[in-house]
Amino acid sequence: MVVPESFQLDQEILLDAGAQLHRLKMYPYFDVAHYLLMIIEVRDDLGSAASIFSRKHPLSCWLSSMLMCFADAFLANFLLGEPVIAPFKRHDDIILATIIWYLVFYAPFDGIYKIAKITPVKCVLAVMKEVKRAYKVSHGVSHAAKLYPNSYIVQVLVGTAKGAGSGIVRTLEQLVRGVWLPTHNELLRPSFATKACVVAASVLALEKSGTYLTAPHDLVYLVIVGFFVYFKLSAVILHVTDPFAPIENLFCAIFMGGIWDAVSRALAASRDRRAAGAHSNENGSSISTPEKKDQ
């Protein structure tokens, strides 16, 4: 099938779009969307006790919110052996995040919180947050590649930490609020955001090496942003929780012992049926023998 030239996407247009997207400044608009959604997650995790907790324990509430807002930088610095407190060196970011924290928890009639929960507003915030997520993953991989140019695993770990650090730091954030749930952490039950960041960081690490992936960086970055935005909107609008689940189930069934476990269960069930059949035959013969004697 021949596609008309009017419908063909020029590669230069895609590269220019990727370059423009890559050069977007995150401060303040994209940072506002990120801070707002992170602090809303803290409030949602508190549930109905959010209002009482924020008034009784404002310091704990503020600290847990800041941990979520800057979790990516905390975790990446920890992995690279850099000062963990470094995210607090920019007072502009702290002031902006604190203002948003105050509006989410203390605005009259919960106005900011309720507005952010409206679906169109939530979609816009989600798109902006995913653009920032792609930006952080890209910069995390680039920073790690400068320090460890021959280590793909370090680049992927740092890129994932920059993009999905909030899920991993959540256990510490809950501990600050007096909640200890060690069985509910991102390493045991990784969210789709963490899995997507692993995939994106792996692609960017391969693209950085130039050995296995030779596509232009701006084009790769544009595809990653589209990947993040598409699945985030699918989760918000269509409630698609984890698109990777079918692939994971198939992979585990083939390579993680799923097939052999199923065969073992089938053999065990077959043995149980044979044993039950033999036992019923023995009971039938023992019952028929006394009847013959009575006759």
Swiss-Prot record:
Q: Which residues lie on this side of the membrane: Cytoplasmic?
A: 46-56, 108-119, 178-188, 240-295
Q: What subunit structure does UniProt give?
A: Homotrimer; trimerization probably requires binding to phosphatidylinositol 4,5-bisphosphate (PIP2).
User: In which organism is this protein found?
Assistant: Caenorhabditis elegans
Cellular compartments per GO CC? endoplasmic reticulum membrane
**Gene name on record?**
tric-1B.1
- InterPro entries recorded: TRIC_channel
Q: Where are the transmembrane segments?
A: 28-45, 57-80, 90-107, 120-148, 151-177, 189-210, 216-239
Q: Which family does it belong to?
A: Belongs to the TMEM38 family.
Matches recorded under PANTHER family? GH25683P (PTHR12454:SF11), TRIMERIC INTRACELLULAR CATION CHANNEL (PTHR12454)
The record's principal subcellular location, in a coarse class, is: endoplasmic reticulum
According to UniProt, the name of this protein is Trimeric intracellular cation channel type 1B.1
What does the record give as the function of this protein?
Potassium channel that mediates transmembrane potassium transport. Might be required for maintenance of rapid intracellular calcium release. May act as a counter-ion channel that functions in synchronization with calcium release from intracellular stores. Binds phosphatidylinositol 4,5-bisphosphate (PIP2).
